[in-house]
């Protein structure tokens, strides 16, 4: 799957345990968020970041992130912060 500059991938808790990622959302070119339950991911291709960090990189993502959290509990509330998963390519 190709990632574009504003893509965000969000996964289940399994990534924190170093296991394979089983649930991924991503932003497609037409602006629709899609869910791929059968897509395989490698943990090394993704990066755990604080939500405030990703919002600081692209403030337009704030509304999208908040809507996604209402749809499904795809975020981590960990260590008193909210976290999401993004591709390494987004932060390079």
Model-derived regions: residue spans:
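Negatively charged, low-complexity tracts enriched in Asp/Glu with abundant Ser/Thr
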Residues: 1-12
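Acidic, aromatic-enriched beta-alpha/helix-loop junctions
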Residues: 11-14, 27-69
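Glycine-centered positions within short beta-strands or beta-hairpins
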Residues: 18-19
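A sequence-level detector of short linear motifs
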Residues: 22-23, 35, 84-85
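Broad, structure-driven detector of short, well-ordered beta-strand segments within folded domains
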Residues: 22-27, 74-76
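Short, compact, well-ordered microdomains
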Residues: 58-92
């Amino acid at each position: 799957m190709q990632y574009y500059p504003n893509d965000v991938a969000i996964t289940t808790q399994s990534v924190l345990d170093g296991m394979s990622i089983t649930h991924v959302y991503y932003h497609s070119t037409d602006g629709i968020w899609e869910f791929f339950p059968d897509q395989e991911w490698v943990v090394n291709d993704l990066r755990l970041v604080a939500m405030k960090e990703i919002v600081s990189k692209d403030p337009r993502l704030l509304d999208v992130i908040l809507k996604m959290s209402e749809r499904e509990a795809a975020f981590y509330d960990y260590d008193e912060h909210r976290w999401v998963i993004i591709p390494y390519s987004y932060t390079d």
